[in-house]
């Protein structure tokens, strides 16, 4: 059996029903480690709801989200969702990367919610918190059920991912697009292979994601690209952005969204610890940029806008397609609205 060697444990030890009160609150069934996913523990839970209503939705292109996972093995050091793991009594650093909560019944619960007479078939965004095509999806395959439920109910959907596992579902996504409006977006903001390995260690390579863009287009779907977050002094040079947007255009993307890094909550400390270790010469500059809060100052955003706008025009990446941005206030503070 494929999972015959799996162990039900947390940190290599049998589960103690009282050891993880945060998980118990959200319906823990069991915790599993498998040799195919070395270093990752999956915490299987039974969720009571699937649809999440977004606060302040008037400022976003969607009002509802579905997230089948909490935590993410992509391990992006800048991930804004890291603080959400603290509610589960995990830390927002390595625990966020290795302790992944799986809502095993999410598709069934979603189908029930979509049958309610009160459901108005508003757009549902997938991938706004943690990546729906992270490694866990290879084991649990939650997305086919989620996509199928939304399409069958007549509900428009959007998908945002760094995960090349989306290729598996391209026939299903293309079929769904015949029934309801569907938008697909790939996140790709780091073109340098060495920096990618350091700052997004669990994600597919930039080249693999470029190939994913091409595959999405070959399936007859538009593909937007989220060039975000742009990292000050690391990925914001004209040379890097020119090369990256050129590659994205060559891959067949229909448009891009560009905005800079924001650092809030415990994500700020996690990222700054990495920066001090990997690029100590940049620490003072980042402290200055973020001294007033989690967002880059207007002067920086204007600089980035002026740098990016000509490149978007050069590579004809100003498509009208609008993907669902991350479920965060950063979506309310873009580089420039015209880049969306």
Curated annotation (Swiss-Prot):
Ranges for domain Radical SAM core: 58-307
Origin: domain of life: Bacteria
Subcellular location: Cell membrane
Entry-linked InterPro entries: Elp3/MiaA/NifB-like_rSAM, MJ0683-like, rSAM
Cofactor requirements of the protein: [4Fe-4S] cluster
Name this polypeptide is given: Uncharacterized protein Mb2609c
Binding of [4Fe-4S] cluster, residues: 72, 76, 79
Predominant subcellular localization, coarse grouping: membrane
Membrane topology: Multi-pass membrane protein
Protein source organism: Mycobacterium bovis (strain ATCC BAA-935 / AF2122/97)
MF terms in GO: 4 iron, 4 sulfur cluster binding; catalytic activity; metal ion binding
GO CC term, one of those recorded: plasma membrane
Transmembrane segments: 140-160, 243-263
Iron-sulfur is among the record's keywords: yes
PROSITE patterns per UniProt: RADICAL_SAM
Cross-referenced CDD domains: Radical_SAM (cd01335)
Upper lineage: Bacteria, Bacillati, Actinomycetota, Actinomycetes, Mycobacteriales
Free-text comment on the cofactor: Binds 1 [4Fe-4S] cluster. The cluster is coordinated with 3 cysteines and an exchangeable S-adenosyl-L-methionine.
Keywords from the named record: 4Fe-4S, Cell membrane, Iron, Iron-sulfur, Membrane, Metal-binding, S-adenosyl-L-methionine, Transmembrane, Transmembrane helix
